[in-house]
């Protein structure tokens, strides 16, 4: 089955297979997440990523997240979660927790945030707390994603709001019913010189004290 731009399909086994083909061919798919609808593509396809930035009119300095079905997918992307982010991820994912992964030399992502001092690039990741979104990610593989709206506009909580924003400029829309709305994730990176070995870049719904407490549960120190 071929897809014309702007096609909307309910989430079924058939539409998931179609979404996987669109992503593999360098297209854009709008998907429901655990917060809002997002526009997504293959994070290894530069042309598709450029298309998201143009579509959203998003400044290039604003990085895209990479959505995963499991941290097991990090290795295939050439990413590592430095300690203690690996422990925090085990505690808070799936959910509103966005650790900053570090790229290995074999990383093939086109979404990496560059560092000015020659250190390895970095990538914010997330595992959505939604069985439906995880099913999509298992079908498509990891996705580079951003909210399905023009930059500065309201985020889409229904597939129709995403269609109204982008129309036929997106290849396929997956309709997963209304989402709950925007929830800020807590963004954390590893920093061996900072308190507890982490720097909290953005405090979201998971409070800073909850993050830090998790590092010391069961007597676990930074080396645990």
Give the location of each predicted region.
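Active-site-adjacent structural elements in enzyme catalytic cores
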Residues: 1-224
């Amino acid at each position: 089955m071929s897809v014309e731009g702007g096609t909307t399909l309910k989430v079924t086994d058939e539409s998931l297979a179609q979404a996987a083909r669109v992503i593999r061919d360098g297209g854009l798919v709008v998907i429901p997440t655990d917060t809002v609808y997002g526009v997504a593509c293959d994070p290894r396809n530069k042309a598709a990523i450029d298309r998201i930035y143009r579509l959203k009119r998003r400044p290039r300095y604003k990085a895209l997240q990479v959505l995963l079905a499991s941290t097991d997918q990090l290795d295939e992307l050439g990413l590592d979660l430095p300690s203690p982010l690996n422990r925090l991820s085990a505690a808070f994912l799936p959910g509103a927790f966005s650790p900053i992964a570090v790229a290995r030399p074999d990383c093939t992502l086109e979404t990496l945030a560059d560092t000015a001092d020659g250190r390895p690039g970095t990538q914010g990741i997330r595992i959505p707390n939604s069985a439906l979104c995880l099913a999509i990610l298992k079908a498509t593989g990891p996705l580079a994603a951003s909210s399905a709206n023009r930059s500065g506009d309201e985020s889409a909580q229904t597939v129709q709001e995403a269609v109204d924003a982008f129309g036929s400029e997106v290849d396929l829309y997956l309709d997963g019913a209304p989402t709950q709305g925007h929830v800020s994730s807590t963004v954390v990176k590893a920093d061996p010189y900072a308190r507890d070995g982490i720097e909290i870049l953005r405090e979201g719904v998971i409070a800073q004290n909850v993050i830090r407490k998790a590092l010391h549960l069961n007597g676990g120190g930074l080396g645990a």
